[in-house]
Amino acid sequence: MPATSKPHSSPPPGLQVCDVTWGPGGSKLFSHLSLDFPLGVTWVCGGEGCGKTSLLRLLAGELQAHKGNITGHGSVFWADPHSDAHESASALAYFASLQARLGPWNASRLAYLTDGLGITEHLHKALYMLSTGTKRKVWLTAAFAAGCSVTLIDEPFAALDRPSIAFVNQELQAVHAQGQGVWVVADYDAPAPWTSADIFQLDRSL
C-alpha cells in the first residue's frame, strides 16, 4: 500500500488516516497507509480481499491499528452487514436504539426514506425475518436519517432491487453535493455518475 494517497484534493479533509499499519494475524494488509477524507462521499473500491471492509472497521473503531492514527470528529454511523447484533429487534426498535445513542432524527425525513426504499410495511418485523435486501434497506435508512459526522457503508447496493439502487445513489449524490458529513462507501466499483475524483482505488498489489 502506498505511503500516502488522497481520494480528493479539496475541500479540507474531515477524517484522516495517518501512517496506519494493520493486518490480521500479524500480516500487513495496510502498511503506512495515509488518507484524507473530506466532507461528502468518497468511494473506496477494489476487488475481493483488498481490505475494503477492514478499512471501514478501522475507521469505525472496531479494529485497532497496529501503528498510526485515525482522526475524526463527532458521531459515527457504521452497521456491519455481517453482524447479527440486532437480529431480534424490529426495524423500529433498531431505529430507536440508534436515536438514543446518536440523537433524535427528523420524523419526516425518516418517513421519506422508508417510503423511498419500500420498507414501511416491514418496520414492525424483527430483522431476522427480513430478506437480505430488506435488511440492508433498514441499515441504509438509518444511515441517511442519522446525519452523523462520519457515515461508513459497506456494499450499499448488494441484494437491492433496481429502484432502490437508484434511490440510494440519488441520496448519496445529494449528501455529497451538500457536504453533509464524511461518507466513506465501500464497493467493488462506483456507479455512474461518480467520477475518479470521488473514488479511492484500494488495491493490495499497489
Task: State the predicted function of each range.
Residues 154, 160-161, 165:
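ABC-family nucleotide-binding domains
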Residues 144-145:
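ABC ATPase C-loop
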Residues 46, 54-100, 190-192, 206:
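ABC ATPase nucleotide-binding domain signature region
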Residues 140:
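Hydrophobic anchor residue at the start of the ABC signature
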Residues 126-133:
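Conserved ABC ATPase signature
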Residues 1-39, 63-64:
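A short, flexible loop at the N-terminus of ABC-type nucleotide-binding domains that lies
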